[in-house]
Every structure is written in C-alpha cells, then in structure tokens.
C-alpha cells in the first residue's frame, strides 16, 4: 500500500460502474490508476456498450459494439483494471427502476466490493438518460444488496448478501472528496486515447455545435483528436483541482450508507 486513497489501509475490491465504456476513464481514470497501483482489485462494469455513440450513419450497431469492447479492454489494461463485465443493455435504454436495480444488486453480490465508484445519484443537468439511470439505481442497489429478501433467487445461485459502506459519485455538483492525480495524469490520458471512436466523435460533435452556434475557435479547429484529448483531460483536471490547490484532480461526492452517513456526529459523542 502506498497512499491510502479513500482511506483504504489494505487491498480491497473496488467496483466501478459506467453507463458507457469511456465514462470511467474520463471521470475517474486517474483515481482508478492510483487504486490499481496501490494493489486494489478493480472490477469495471459497462452497463451498455455505448454502441450508438457515433455520427457516422454507415456504421452498424454490431460494428460499434465490437469497437467499443476492444477499446474498453485496451483502456482497462492501461489503468490496471482486473476485469471488465458487460451488462449488455442497449445504449440509451437504461431505465431506473426495479429491473436495473436487480441487475446491479446481482453484480454487487458477485463482486463483493468495499467501495463503489460511479455517477453521482443526484447528478445535475446531465442530458443523457443512461447517466441518470446508473447513478440513481446503482446507489439504491448498493443499499439493498445486503438484505437477503431482496431478490432471494440470487442466493440460490450462490450470491450472498453483501454490505457496501461507501459510494463515491463522480460528476457531482457538491463534491466533498478530491483526489490528486498528478502522478497518474499521463496514464489517464493514455486510457482515454484508447477510445478513439468516441474521442473523434466528441471532437466532431463539439465542432458541429460551435459552428451551428456561430462560434469560431481557431485553436480547436486545428486540433487532431489526440491533442483534443490531452487538452480536455488536462484542463478539466486543472479546473477541478484549482480551488483545493491541487495541480490535477478528480472530484467525487463521498456517501456513507446507514450509520456511516452521520459518522462525524457520532465521533463527537
């Protein structure tokens, strides 16, 4: 153990849950790399393949699925992720509710994580319904996973109830945990670069929106996609860390379940 990220003093299992294959690298890649370097076991769940993330109408869903799977495995190798699991729900069709909660509860019971990383359950102003569905439903599943009468059929398949204590939500409007990723920034950039299909799409979409809105940013016009990735990742990490005087950071909202949510008050008794 090196740094004790998230106050972990010994190797643990960390579950990272994405809506789409590039989410974790973009929002938490530096932190995931730190955790892997510290000896923790990282398991990554892709809720969808992100197969609709293209502006090229000549592409098929099957082609995009194969591309996204390859890119996600490559990114996992860069970050040090041990296992990548695919939930196999169609892109854009994740629906918050009982069905998705049962899927997530099953994964939590199978993986038995100490900590879960994903979207903030109270994610604000995110236009993608998949992001909202993942954050809210996974947060609920981490609570129900230790109650045996929730989805008891899972126990007949050897999946025991499991207690999750801490949930760390990225893309939060109220972050309370900031991780210095200065030593893993380059690794995060390399991981994001593995998603060539998505980064090229993101750059093209950005240019289309600027052009349609009448804005002209010469520097952006001249960027090739890898330079765009480096600029986006670096500037975002700098902006997050600025108020905490951290050169490059990622931010999360740390949520404790049950009594852990009032731990500071209890420690004052």
PLM-predicted stretches and their roles:
Residues 1-111, 262-265:
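Active-site rim/loop-helix segments in enzyme catalytic domains that contact anionic ligands
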Residues 20, 128-131, 195:
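Histidine-centered active-site/metal-ligand motif
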Residues 1-11, 147-160, 171-269:
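C-terminal accessory domains and tails appended to enzymatic cores
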Residues 54-58, 129-131, 179-181:
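Short aromatic-enriched loop/helix-cap "lid" or pocket-rim segments at secondary-structure transitions
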Residues 43, 73-167:
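Internal alpha/beta domain cores that form substrate/cofactor-binding pockets in large enzymes
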Residues 34, 38, 140-145, 194:
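Active-site catalytic microenvironments for nucleophilic, acid-base chemistry
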Residues 16, 46, 86-88, 118, ...:
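Structural signal for conserved beta-strand scaffold positions within catalytic alpha/beta enzyme cores
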